[in-house]
Swiss-Prot record:
Gene3D superfamilies: Nucleotide-binding domain of ferredoxin-NADP reductase (FNR) module, Translation factors
Organism: Vibrio harveyi (Beneckea harveyi)
CDD domains: flavin_oxioreductase
Function: Involved in bioluminescence. It is a good supplier of reduced flavin mononucleotide (FMNH2) to the bioluminescence reaction. Preferably uses riboflavin as an electron acceptor when NADPH is used as an electron donor.
EC number: 1.5.1.-
Species classification: Bacteria, Pseudomonadati, Pseudomonadota, Gammaproteobacteria, Vibrionales
Name of a matching Pfam family: NAD_binding_1
UniProt: pyridine binding residues: G115, G116, T117, G118, F119
Keywords: FAD, Flavoprotein, Luminescence, Oxidoreductase
Keyword Flavoprotein among UniProt keywords: yes
Protein name: NAD(P)H-flavin reductase
Domain FAD-binding FR-type positions: 2-103
Family: Belongs to the Fre/LuxG FAD/NAD(P) flavoprotein oxidoreductase family.
Amino acid sequence: MTIQCKVKSIQPLACNTYQILLHPESPVPFKAGQYLMVVMGEKDKRPFSIASSPCRHEGELELHIGAAEHNAYALEVVEAMQAALETDGHIEIDAPHGDAWVQEESERPLLLIAGGTGFSYVRSILDHCVAQNKTNPIYLYWGARDNCQLYAKEELVEIADKFANVHFVPVVEEAPADWQGKVGNVLQAVSEDFESLENYDIYIAGRFEMAGAAREQFTQNKKAKSERMFADAYAFI
């Protein structure tokens, strides 16, 4: 479904990463974990995970877009959003999309794994589960190059402190001397912490290679069930 949206705000979150709030002309029914397509042209639609959960923000849609200078694909979208904001114009989106939404009926513990701005996908799921007062154990592993890119770290620490069933583990490749989290690869960190993933619902967002490696490693080495692993990437790989 194609919908016109006003761009409500654009805020920098971290190095080259922006939070964008969209206000659609009509409500967009979506499930936590789905994505939208920003329509840049008739045959040019670009996918971004919806970072907000369906039960919040009074119909607003939140995006987190990583737009480094070398990433023209995302940078052009941010520039189009900026132009719409400055001229009080519209952005066109096509939504909702994706089959990797949260399995609300499941009572299994959740393992949420994000690489970089893949965090927006797991944030929607976490936010939704917390808002719905779900009591399933939730483990969120967020990997990034450095601490600067973990732009929601303080928010996640607060959520984990407030809700006994939520556990947050930050993972960076380059750690400062006073670093309190894990160092290295996010999939390696998960492998070190879990003997078995047999009983988990696993949600993954990041590069396609990471999602593919997770499916291979976790099903072969950690007894994960491939049918209980969810990622947008799995529709393509």
